[in-house]
């Protein structure tokens, strides 16, 4: 079910179990990138691992927020993904207005605040840090871009816009950008330099 209101079929070849998206995930079909070999077999690119309904009230940035910021509007349909996306966009917009992250202009237009995504990211980070702190009984040490992080890769947290790695030390932890290369080292010591934030 696609954003144009039609159902599309694509031959993706053989997918391993990890590459099959879960029901409710939002994906895009993508070919090879600029630095990759051209291929006739499209690949799935995960846009969000969170279903639309949960995104409407999520305390953090979502695929819906990106659609709102870029002023994307689905084609109007009565059923299917486009109808669900339209309904979710309206619900998310109302939620953002309630949080004063979208402002109403005098002519009735709804305009996202310039710092909307940053404010959502900060709210998400604070909530995730508090949750992990309670669970691990440890204090969160925020990562600073360009600094070195060492510790044990504990687990990953899936958010609507990606994953965050929990790097644990004795009585502290850091929420760091997640990379697929970390997965084989779960439960093991890791080290790295913090790059740009998500």
Model-derived features: where do they sit?
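Extended intrinsically disordered terminal tails
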Residues: 1-198
């Amino acid at each position: 079910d696609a954003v144009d209101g039609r159902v599309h079929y694509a031959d993706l070849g053989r997918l391993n179990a990890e590459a099959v998206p879960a029901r409710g995930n939002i994906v895009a079909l993508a070919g090879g990138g600029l630095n990759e070999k051209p291929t006739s077999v499209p690949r799935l690119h995960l846009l969000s691992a969170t279903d639309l309904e949960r995104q409407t009230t999520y305390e953090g940035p979502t695929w819906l927020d990106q659609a709102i910021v870029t002023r994307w509007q689905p084609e109007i349909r009565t059923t299917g993904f486009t109808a669900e996306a339209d309904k979710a966009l309206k619900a998310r917009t109302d939620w953002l207005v309630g949080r004063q992250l979208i402002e109403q202009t005098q002519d009735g237009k709804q305009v996202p605040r310039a710092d909307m995504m940053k404010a959502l990211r900060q709210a998400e980070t604070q909530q995730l840090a508090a949750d992990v702190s309670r669970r691990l009984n440890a204090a969160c040490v925020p990562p600073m871009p360009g600094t070195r992080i060492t510790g044990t890769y504990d687990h990953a947290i899936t958010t609507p816009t990606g994953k965050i790695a929990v790097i644990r030390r004795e009585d502290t932890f850091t929420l760091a950008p997640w990379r697929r290369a970390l997965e084989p080292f779960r439960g093991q010591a890791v080290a790295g330099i913090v790059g740009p934030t998500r």
